[in-house]
Amino acid sequence: MDIKKSIEHFMYELRLNQNQLAIKAGMDISTLSLIRNQLRSPSLATLNKLATACEVKVSEFIA
């Protein structure tokens, strides 16, 4: 699963919109938007924030 699909999958599962996920992950909504639109590659630290916010391991997030 690519990053975009993972983000959308976990947003759906957790019933979060993009703004809610960004807040929960402690990141700017614009950064999350760029990642979702595949205009920016997330750093490992950003992946960790997203995975933590989605309550999964990074390996599950990028698998």
Model region roles, listed by residue range:
Residues 1-17:
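A short, Lys/Arg-rich alpha-helix, primarily the initiator
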Residues 15, 41-44:
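Residue at a beta-strand N-cap/secondary-structure junction
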Residues 11, 22, 51:
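The alpha-helix within a helix-turn-helix
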Residues 12, 26, 37-39, 63:
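Residue-level detection of the helix-turn-helix DNA-binding "recognition helix"
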Residues 45-60:
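DNA major-groove recognition helix of helix-turn-helix/homeodomain DNA-binding modules
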Residues 16-34:
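Short alpha-helical DNA-recognition segment
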Residues 10, 44-45:
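Short, Lys/Arg-enriched C-terminal cap helix and immediately downstream tail that follows
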